[in-house]
């Protein structure tokens, strides 16, 4: 609308967008790369893959897209092709009205929105994201789930998939005696070198490289959170009898994965917050503004967890969720939320330098509101 020449329009637009695009892309890329600190290869590998994708997107947006827009001209915006008239049309529309409402009652606006988000965030602690068994991942009752429930009804839950302890051959009896009374244990027996045939002598214990395996049957489903809670005590007792004992099997693997996810939540999230604060501080030239913006995004993150808790746990009644969910939700929600803040605040700063803080904020909101909403 403001420029008759599409080249002049592109020059003005490019000057205004390259900095926030680089800043937002860098923020998301660095946030994803922080996943490399994860103890799980499945999580760590996602970091560089996602970061490479973001960098490629930035290159495309800053090079290929402008070239295509210049090549094809205004008709590419059909059916609402912009025509040159010299007027600034951005101060009209829905977001202009929203901006005027906020301008009239700024205190009421932030109190209402902040209170609403806090109410949603208050439900976040009720979110069940401490792990979930395989049978609980189904919303229906397939044959495998029916079979597992039948097994748990008539036999120990871990009958078909025992926990295994690798021990020194001369420590079999000591370890067996140590773990047989552990919580959740229903049966302990060494792995035999052959099949048990009625009326025939029992096969010898299978020993390989002076190591033997002891099968420990638990009374709960092997992939359940409850079975995993028994693993630390079993490990403690086994190692009290054999310091080289190693406890493995499905229950142990699931427990270790949940432990690693918990550690990732406690380390990666704070590192991400620190890095994002630095990037925002450099972009906005103000650490206070960066902390304020980060606070709004963190509040929206906890509000999102609260909504998830209300919907998944209290409305649909799901058994729970993977304990890696909070980390992935944080990385993507906070990274995207910071993106939107960068788009908004970059334009607000630009407009504030021209027309003052208050009208600059309203102009920035009006210009970026539709873009943020559609994104």
Residue ranges with predicted function:
Residues 1-129, 240-375:
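Membrane-embedded transmembrane helical bundles of large multi-pass transporters/channels
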Residues 129-320, 342:
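Structured non-transmembrane domains adjacent to transmembrane bundles in polytopic membrane proteins
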């Amino acid at each position: 609308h403001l420029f008759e020449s599409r080249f002049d329009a592109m020059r003005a637009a490019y000057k205004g967008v390259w900095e926030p695009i680089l800043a937002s892309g860098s923020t998301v890329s660095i946030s994803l790369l922080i996943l490399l600190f994860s103890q799980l290869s499945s999580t760590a590998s996602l970091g560089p893959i996602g970061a490479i994708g973001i960098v490629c997107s930035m290159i495309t947006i800053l090079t290929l897209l402008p070239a295509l827009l210049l090549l094809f001209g205004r008709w590419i915006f059909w059916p609402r092709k912009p025509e040159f008239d010299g007027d600034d049309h951005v101060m009209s529309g829905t977001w202009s009205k929203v901006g005027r409402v906020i301008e009239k009652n700024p205190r009421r606006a932030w109190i209402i929105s902040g209170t609403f988000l806090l109410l949603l965030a208050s439900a976040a602690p009720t979110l069940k994201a401490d792990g979930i068994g395989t049978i609980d991942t189904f919303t229906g009752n397939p044959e495998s789930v029916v079979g597992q429930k039948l097994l748990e009804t008539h036999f120990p839950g871990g009958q078909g998939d025992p926990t295994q302890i690798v021990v020194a051959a001369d420590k079999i009896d000591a370890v067996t005696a140590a773990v047989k009374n552990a919580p959740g244990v229903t049966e302990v027996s060494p792995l035999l070198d052959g099949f048990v045939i009625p009326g025939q002598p029992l096969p010898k214990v299978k020993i390989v490289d002076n190591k033997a395996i002891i099968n420990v049957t638990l009374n709960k489903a092997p992939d359940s959170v409850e079975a995993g809670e028994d693993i630390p005590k079993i490990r403690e007792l086994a190692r009290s009898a054999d310091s080289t004992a190693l406890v493995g099997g499905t229950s142990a693997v699931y427990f270790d994965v949940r432990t690693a996810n918990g550690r990732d939540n406690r380390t990666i999230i704070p590192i991400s917050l620190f890095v994002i604060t630095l990037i925002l501080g450099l972009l906005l030239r103000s650490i206070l503004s960066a902390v304020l913006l980060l606070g709004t995004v963190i509040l929206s993150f906890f509000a999102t967890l609260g909504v998830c808790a209300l919907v998944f746990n209290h409305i649909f009644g799901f058994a729970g969720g993977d304990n890696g969910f909070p980390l992935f939700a944080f990385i993507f929600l906070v990274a995207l939320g910071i993106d939107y803040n960068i788009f908004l605040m970059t334009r607000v700063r630009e407009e504030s330098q021209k027309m003052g803080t208050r009208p600059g904020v309203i102009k920035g909101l009006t210009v970026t509101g539709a873009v943020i909403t559609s994104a």
